Amino acid sequence: RLFDAVALRKELDFDLVTRQYVNEIPYFLQRSFTNWEVENKVEVVNGNYIRTIKVKTPVKELRQVEGGPYNEKIMNGIQFRTMEYLSKDQDDFEVFKKYCPRREKRDVDHILESGKIAKKEIGDLGISCPWAMGGVYNLASTYINVQDMMVDALSEEDYYEDYMNFFADLVASDHEIFVDSQFDCVGMQGNIANGGMMGPDYFEEYVLPYERKAIDVLRQGKKPIIYHNCGKARVLYPAYKKLGITVWETISEAPQGDNVLAEAKEYFKDDLILFGNFDQVHFLKEATPEEVEKRAYDLMMTGKKGGHYIFACSDYLEIGTPLENVKALLRGARAASRYE
């Protein structure tokens, strides 16, 4: 992602915010450690990639199975869906917590070296904002079924608190390394705990304290945070003010989200920076260049009032997006970018 983004920036001339993965798979599933033997296998079954991760401990074997669409040309960037979770019950989690290894020096060095490389490659073309280990709720839901998590918070309070604190500590320790890196800011995924999944009271009681624990590490280290929720978020606006984040992306409108840029601008004012809002799923891909240019101009005129806005699409470009539409997007945004 880093090198492709820099090359694209040089070709199309836009302000760059790179969103590369430093560790797409967490360190504890990349390789084996003492009492933690990892086997990672990817195979094609019935037209799908199936990724199976097995972890053998002295007590029992944990297993995670994920699937994604098969494409013989690509492997990176595939969105895998979990079919079997590493931690299926409280017994599994106790094993996970007991034997999950600590980082080694090589893991720390990898993050720090990645920051140096990003700094050198990007230069004055923009800033780097890699994905760290993830938002706490997102990370927990990678290894524990989110349906169980929703219920655990209400019916198994001690168990829920135990695993959320465990994952919060993992993310916080990850953030401590990023604070010492040359990356300009840090990305946190917060799209699982979205406004379509839960209400504001639930979020503030069962999600916010753990996210804030990890966010505070970055705040104390003066490292800006981009918090990602590309879905519904309107009911969570009050909670987002309490998160302590620097930037919230992506302000997605219907049908992907329920946000309206003008309303979000009015609500947040200068409490945080808004990032995104242009529909790349349908409009950028399907509209004419003229329509794209006008929409980009209009969105920029709305977003730039009072500052605290970064114009962008609401997520990555879809396969099949016409290059002429991307160029039209940039023309429209540039035409409205000046303050006069």
Language-model-derived ranges and their functions:
Residues R1, T82, S87-E340:
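Active-site loop segments of alpha/beta catalytic cores
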Residues R1-V65, P69-K73, E113-I117, I122-I127, ...:
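N-terminal basic, low-complexity leaders that serve as flexible interaction/assembly modules and, when applicable
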Residues Q64-G67, N76, L139-Y143:
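Short, conserved acidic/polar surface loops in the N-terminal third of protein domains
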Residues N71-E84:
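Short, surface-exposed linear segments at secondary-structure transitions and domain or protein termini
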